[in-house]
Structure formats: structure tokens, C-alpha cells
Amino acid sequence: MIKEQNYRVWLLAFLYAGIYVFLIPWVDIIGKEFEDTANYLFRIIYLQEGGTEAHYSGIKWLLDEPVWRFIILALGETFNDYRLSLYFISFIGMLLYGSFFFRRVEFYVVMILLLNPMSVNLFIEQVRITLAFGLLLFAYDLSSKYLKIVIALIAFMIHASMPIFIGIYFILYYYNSRVEARKYYLITVGIALGMALFMKFGLNAILTAVGDRHAGYGDIAGGSSIAYSIVWFMIASIIAIFANFENDEERIFAGYAIVFMSFFFFGSIFGIYGQRYVAVIMPIIIIAIGYLPPHIKQGTYLFMFSYSLLMFKYWFELTLI
């Protein structure tokens, strides 16, 4: 029975990822190239034509994301169509997301994830963080602790932000059995505020000190509007107040969703680009909404679906300007 269920999960994930990545012409729909895609294409072409990049050792080597460098080189050597090679990475990332997602939610709920501009940007454009976090989701469902550690290390060497996602999980895991629900959710909001303050005032100084190329990125990227982020903070509040749990995993997932949705809100106040973090953990947010009482759950799903369609309208209008 378990093997049959796993087979169905991977089949659904395969079909979902294939349709989303290869059959929907996202670039034609929005009428312009994705910025990160253009940067990846330029890097592949540059390296294939004999271009060179700096090489590091020690901590700088880890922070330089060596596995992603290897993947970029491998894509250039393996594929003649470099854009197709990036779509292949999108497909793998979505497949890993799907293997996690379809074990925990009804099929129709996937449409909420699908019809969301943030998800399009994540899966089609920001393929590096999609692949890295997808590996973490895949590792979560493995039984072997050794494999979990190895895969987490690989994910870190694809995208250096992965320790943030891992660290938040273990903080929530630590407090889960030590505090009651009300304090637990106050802690999640406190973690989110602490993250925003750290990324605003501390992270850039650390990255500059170690000579990391990501130093100053937050200032360049800028923040999202408070009006946009407050919607996600409202959803976080609904989960914190009304969610019911059957086990520790569900409580931790809910806390995880609350942390990053709250961080998005606080980040918008401080001018930090927090939208991407919500996009990355979108499956966990949707799973956490599933812990709400039926009438609140359905209403929240409907609200998210409607809000996503509205954001698509706004997104398309911006791309046409």
C-alpha cells in the first residue's frame, strides 16, 4: 500500500511539473524574459565560450555555492538548448516540491499553488533556490539521517540561504515540546521580527566581512509593499488563532508558515525583500491552512485563490507597461 501511494505521489508530481514547466509558455504569456533566467543564460554562454570565474577556498568556497557552479557547467556541456536546460532544473525542482506536497494535501489545492505569480517566478525563474529547497523537502521525508545531512549539505552548496530555512525548523522543533500554544506563536512572530532586524542591520556586515558576493544584495533588491505583505500576515494570524493539530509535525509546519509570512510583513516595513521566502515555502503555507476548521479552511483557500488571480491581473498589467 505504501509503495502504491508513493508511486501515485511521484506520478502526480511528474505530471504537475511537466505541464507547468514545459506546456505553459510563461515567457510568451507575460511578454518578456525573466531577469534571473537571462542572467543564468548569460553565465552558461560565458563559461562555454571560455570565460573564467574566481575560485575560492575554505568558507568562501562554500559560500560561493560550488554545486550550483558545477550544475551550470554541466548544463552547458549537456544541452544544446540552454533555455531548455534551465527548464529541466525547474522540472526537477517542481518534482521534488510535488513529492512533498502531494503526500499532504488534496489534488485541487495544488491549483492555489499553481495560480500564484510568486510561484511562477519561483519555479520558472528562480530555479536555483527552487532546486535547493526542493532537495530539503525531499530529504525531510527520508528515514536515513545520514542521507538527510548529505542532501542538506548539497542544498546549501546550491543556495547559501538554506541554513536559514533549516535553522528556523530546528528552533521551532526545540520550542515545540517546551511551550504552550500561545507562547509558541508569540515565539514564531518574535523569530520573524528578529530575522528582519538581523537582515536589515547585521547580515550585510557579516557578508562584507567574509567577502561574500551577496553583500549588499538586500539593498539592491528592495522590499515589497506593506499592503501586499499584510495579506500574508493576516493569513499567519488566522493559522495562529484557529488551527487544530493532531501531531507535532503539524504544529511545527504551522509555526514555520507563520514565521516566514510574518517575516515578509516585517521585512516590508524595513525595506527587505521577503517575498521570495514566502514563495519558497508556499507548499507549507497551504498545508498549514489545511489544519484550520473546515469552514475557515475553505474560506481561506478561496481567499488565496481569488487574491492570486488578482495578483496575476496586476502582474500582467505591469509586464505590459
Where in this protein do the model-derived segments appear?
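Start-transfer (signal-anchor) and selected internal transmembrane alpha helices
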Residues: 1-22
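Alpha-helical transmembrane segments and terminal signal-anchor/GPI-anchor hydrophobic tails
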Residues: 7, 22-56, 65, 69, ...
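Juxtamembrane segments of multi-pass membrane glycosylation machinery
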Residues: 70-88
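Transmembrane-helix motifs of polytopic, lipid-linked glycan transferases
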Residues: 87-105
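Membrane-embedded alpha-helical segments of multi-pass membrane proteins
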Residues: 88-92, 127-135, 158-167, 227-235, ...
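Membrane-embedded helix bundles of polyisoprenyl
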Residues: 108-126, 130
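Membrane-interface transmembrane helices that cradle and orient dolichyl/undecaprenyl
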Residues: 136-147
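Signature aromatic-anchored transmembrane alpha helix within multi-pass, membrane-resident enzymes
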Residues: 182-191, 297-314
